[in-house]
Amino acid sequence: MIQITLPDASKREYPQAVTVAEVAASIGAGLAKAALGGKVDGKVVDTSYLIEKDSALSIITAKDADGLELIRHSTAHLLAYAVKELFSEAQVTIGPVIENGFYYDFAYKRPFTPEDLAAIEKRMTELAAKDEPVTRRVLPRDEAVAHFKSIGEHYKAEIIASIPANEDVSLYREGTFEDLCRGPHVPSTGKLKFFKLMKVAGAYWRGDHRNEMLQRVYGTAWATKDELQQYLTMLEEAEKRDHRKLGKELDLFHIDDHAPGLVFWHPKGWTIWQGVEQYMRKVYQDNGYQEVKGPQVIDKTLWEKTGHWDKYRDNMFTTESEKREYALKPMNCPGHILIFKQGIKSYRDLPLRYGEFGQCHRNEPSGGLHGIMRVRGFTQDDGHIFCTEEQILKECVDYTTLLQKVYTDFGFKNIIYKVATRPDARIGSDESWDKAEQALIESLRASGCEFEISPGEGAFYGPKIEYTLKDAIGRQWQCGTMQVDFSMPERLDAEYVGEDGARHRPVMLHRAIVGSLERFIGILIEEHAGALPTWLAPIQVSVLNITDSQAEYAREVAKTLQNQGLRVNLDLRNEKITYKIREHSLQKLPYILVVGDKEKAAGAVAVRARGNKDLGVMSIEAFAQQIASDIAQKA
């Protein structure tokens, strides 16, 4: 007898080995129809998987996260099937699931066109409607190599040839198409109903620029029509908010081919930058951080001690001078330890908090660069706290409270909290890990935060809290971090004198709130669709005259507001006022002030707020009070 334990702890017995599909059918016809796969003792499998011993089983449907993964994986195969039907000379390579969808790489004699993409998607819909069964078979490695060579699929043959000779490989077939795959997959193509092909791009075989260029077709797939439509609507909204597009329209910054992955800030963009930096500098000052500054170029011997030279060298920019090798720093932490080590530190000095607006460089691959969100040169609000194990809890509580205030001030209300715990490969004693993990968890509880545990996702040198922002259109951005580090103080021999007179290692807490300022400003631009809150807006108010006779009065108004510390633009051009209002509105300014003869005579201004709101005529003093209130409230 085979005993199956279901998620509700109920048990079912079967006289002999049984498939996942058969168990689903024995529970009910509805479940049998909805089943996409199963999870047997924690492992996701096909519905055809044969259970031969007592096991725990949950049936996977489209409502489950694993079900969506199965749908996307199988839709990637459906894409390859359709391409082979329409372009028989194309060779298939790989097709993994990615966030929100999948892609598949093809070798073909020419790039696919938008018309090709439409035809492929149409063929996918037709193949799905045929509801062809998806079946699995297993072959010895060499047999599988010979099979794919015989049908002209040389990329597949190359992939399989790299697998150890004594291993078998699994193949999945739907209709006339068969592909190498570990699986699992949905039971038939009819389960794949809600998908869309998004774009085609170039990609090198095996990610190596020395290899052939392939065609990468991206797609998305969802469990329901509504979810697909919501995702496509979100993408449309994201396109309108794209910081690269808004950066150009609002004249904030540009990226130049002369310096790929590095940002040229224009005056208005740099004003935003300075606003963020000055705000964060005040955060340092108000919360017991001492601001420091370290060099950008550091001898490789330091990076050898920290382990970066072994593990991270490919991502570092290096240079040589006088027969010494140097690297542009990819992170600030080693420099802060060198500062900590200057002079004897006592337990009375702890916790010691350093903060730096540290410029870092990382040699990101060109394909991964994205506007100002993913760059090669960036500045972090990088802080490091040197403390004892007993001080971790309070430092984390204080940090979380501070982070929440900062995010609220920038307009973010929705924060997701995750605690990443010890991985199998780690340094430090279990006792130290217990203390650190407990401190992180207790700090979030003390702050009233709901959080998730991510088992095994901590770094080898310590656990961490990840703080993720959810933006106006539901996207998630991981910005803040609180990382416990037992390793680097040891590697770089940081010490303090304890109450007992002996030397001890401090614990190092790496913390960032906004992270990369470049990336955070990109997130801000997209969150607010370019209409930044008044306190951050590069131009807070534009003063417009209607005719030349009000020009001098307009200058006086602008000067008065500038003297109050406001960022003011004065537009005295001889253009129609409607044209000027429209032009400044497109720049998403918080306020536009119009002055005509009536306003001049009354010593007043006509006020328009963002969103084409007419606030009527105000005295200059009343307007100044209103905008000052906006700034004070971070509105």
Curated annotation (Swiss-Prot):
Coarse class of the protein's main subcellular location: cytoplasm
Biological source species: Polaromonas sp. (strain JS666 / ATCC BAA-500)
Cofactor(s) this protein requires: Zn(2+)
GO-annotated biological processes: threonyl-tRNA aminoacylation
UniProt-listed CDD domains: TGS_ThrRS, ThrRS_anticodon, ThrRS_core
Enzyme nomenclature, EC number: 6.1.1.3
Keywords: Aminoacyl-tRNA synthetase, ATP-binding, Cytoplasm, Ligase, Metal-binding, Nucleotide-binding, Protein biosynthesis, RNA-binding, tRNA-binding, Zinc
Start and end residues of each stretch annotated as Catalytic: 242-533
Protein's job: Catalyzes the attachment of threonine to tRNA(Thr) in a two-step reaction: L-threonine is first activated by ATP to form Thr-AMP and then transferred to the acceptor end of tRNA(Thr). Also edits incorrectly charged L-seryl-tRNA(Thr).
Catalytic activity: tRNA(Thr) + L-threonine + ATP = L-threonyl-tRNA(Thr) + AMP + diphosphate + H(+)
Domain of life: Bacteria
Pfam families, alphabetized: HGTP_anticodon, TGS, tRNA-synt_2b, tRNA_SAD
Subcellular location: Cytoplasm
Protein name: Threonine--tRNA ligase
Domain named TGS: residues: 1-61
Residues annotated to bind Zn(2+): 333, 384, 510
PANTHER family (alphabetical): THREONINE--TRNA LIGASE, CHLOROPLASTIC_MITOCHONDRIAL 2, THREONINE-TRNA LIGASE
Gene field: thrS
Free-text comment on the cofactor: Binds 1 zinc ion per subunit.
Enzyme class: ligase
Quaternary structure (record): Homodimer.
Example GO molecular function: ATP binding
The keyword Transcription regulation is annotated on this UniProt entry: no
GO cellular component, one term: cytoplasm
Signal sequence segment: none
Family the UniProt entry places it in: Belongs to the class-II aminoacyl-tRNA synthetase family.
